[in-house]
């Protein structure tokens, strides 16, 4: 699966349309970006060494950031749609217009790669994961 398939398969958007919306939203700003995120999570709950609950969740969304002089604004949504991106762009209008609020120091920049493209949730089957956790609990 290509990364763009994670965001554009059901959103009614494609990569080029999202890029055009982002360019329109950031017109007049010094810098900015559209950040998209897709998250998979899995959890297991044991009680008295017995599996009591197992959960799996998938979520996705985006953040739109605009920088103008020393002011940055950020808007986000879990709805990956044209309407949501336009709504986020509207929330950034004061920053792009030169108005400011609370200023935060930028985080320290790093170029350290923290993650690989390997999905650990696909590595082992459900039964194998439960067995590993049961073995750990029996120690």
Segments predicted by a language model, with ranges:
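Active-site bordering "gate/hinge" segments
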Residues: 1-139
